[in-house]
Amino acid sequence: MAFQLTPLRVALVAGEPSGDLLGASLLGGLHARLPASSRYYGIGGPRMSAVEFDAHWPMEKLAVRGYVEALKHIPEILRIRGELKRQLLAEPPDAFVGIDAPDFNFGLEQALRGAGIPTIHFVCPSIWAWRGGRIKKIVKAVDHMLCLFPFEPELLEKAGVAATFVGHPLADEIPLEPDTHGARIALGLPGGGPVIAVLPGSRRSEIELIGPTFFDAMELMQQREPGVRFVVPAATPALRALLQPLVDAHPSLSVTLTEGRAQVAMTAADAILVKSGTVTLEAALLKKPMVISYKVPWLTGQIMRRQGYLPYVGLPNILAGRFVVPELLQHFATPDALADATLTQLRDDANRRALADIFTDMHLALRQNTAQRAAEAVAHVIDSRKPR
């Protein structure tokens, strides 16, 4: 790093919990790689704030899911983006890192890049999964892309965007062999007997849409597999309060409702019923059979269906390039279908062994010391812009 008279300043924006995780990992690497006097600020969540990050706005302001659902929040989101843009243009940082949240970050990155501020984007949008458009935005907005998956840099470099594969921090964090017995002890679950983890989402809207269906499926599973126990982790106290009435409405269920501890809950499980998202990758890294599902409002679903061209939405299937675990989406996500598919995943030992091999290969491919690799790439971009 060239000699620096004033502290380096790196602005970062994360818009949802998965971005907060990535941001915290990156910040850990930056603290080790850049001068100790460097400052980090912008928009982030609690994990980023815990590693010396100054959050000018809380991440929750941007955490809105779905096309239709976002409409009512657009004025405030645009106001925040406009104010942040004015601040960053008035006092330019040495680099800007947008962490996922492409709808928010790309417009901001394009404006900053136009003003000569180096722009880095962490998490390549799914240009390989969705039709058209976004690659053009990336070319205009991004100086360097940090990619979680190994096949992404080649796609970007063909379009003229510099990119680095950095792996996924979850692959660094999660052990290659999960301690199922230890996780059951931590949750107060019996060591024997089947356990299914059920994760209906990390947002109120997700739980309201699919939570009742998941609990009805749990009721059917317990009827068909009487010894089964369920563990349902709630991401926050507010979401636990939202889930509690569903637990109360199914008094015969053997269910443990936890606050946080999603990874422990999945580690304790023999099979997982999970709403699509980053958590499906976490389940794969834990080597667990699973069923992936989601429900979104009808119009949002229609828009997503028309934009997508991959036949799958779950990260385990995307990374494998084929269906290795079942997906039941929208109107296919009925209690009966979910119960049947999840119990099949629970009972099929040959499938369990095959998935363990597939998921171990994924784990090894993604285990790249992400914090160090990502921080090194950011430092290289900053250093390449500094006068010698």
Curated annotation (Swiss-Prot):
Name this polypeptide is given: Lipid-A-disaccharide synthase
Protein's organism: Burkholderia mallei (strain ATCC 23344)
GO cellular component: membrane
Coiled coil residues, start to end: none
Catalyzed reaction equations: a lipid X + a UDP-2-N,3-O-bis[(3R)-3-hydroxyacyl]-alpha-D-glucosamine = a lipid A disaccharide + UDP + H(+)
InterPro entries registered for this protein in UniProt: Glyco_trans_19
Keywords: Glycosyltransferase, Lipid A biosynthesis, Lipid biosynthesis, Lipid metabolism, Transferase
Keyword Lipid metabolism among record annotations: yes
GO annotation, biological process: lipid A biosynthetic process
Annotated pathway: Bacterial outer membrane biogenesis; LPS lipid A biosynthesis
Underlying gene: lpxB
Family, as annotated: Belongs to the LpxB family.
Enzyme Commission number(s) from the entry: 2.4.1.182
GO molecular function, one term: phospholipid binding
HAMAP family: LpxB (MF_00392)
Functional summary from the UniProt entry: Condensation of UDP-2,3-diacylglucosamine and 2,3-diacylglucosamine-1-phosphate to form lipid A disaccharide, a precursor of lipid A, a phosphorylated glycolipid that anchors the lipopolysaccharide to the outer membrane of the cell.
